[in-house]
Amino acid sequence: MTEIGTVIDGKYEILREIGRGGMSIVYLAMDTHLNKQWAVKEIRKKGNGKNDEVVVNSLLAEANMMKKLDHPALPRIVDIIDNGITIYVVMDYIEGESLDKVLNEYGAQPEEQVIAWAEQLCEALEYLHSQKPPIIYLSLIHI
């Protein structure tokens, strides 16, 4: 786990944790050169599992594939940093609240809003499926 205040690659200052998964932690970071916020996904190369190398290689392949995509509903990958122990994937920071938080705080949303979200999701999936070869997204948890 990277400590808050750490500067990665001489320019990305870690501000706070914004998400966590099985093999990665996502931080909000500030590019100290451009004064711009980014999301930085930290992927530890060694964990406690025997399949760590496979998982890390899979996450790295996903990041390299995402670098080539250009769609307004998908965050751009702008940098991949490998310091030998940890891989950092720097991507667009998209402000807002998670759907889970919106539902917990505000309850069911109006039908028009849900339809608008579904249309945006379908447009992003259509874009992914139109790639050569098609990109099949298996988990919609974090979209």
Where are these regions (language model features)?
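Protein kinase glycine-rich loop
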Residues: 15-22, 26
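Activation-segment/catalytic-loop signature of the eukaryotic protein kinase fold
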Residues: 80
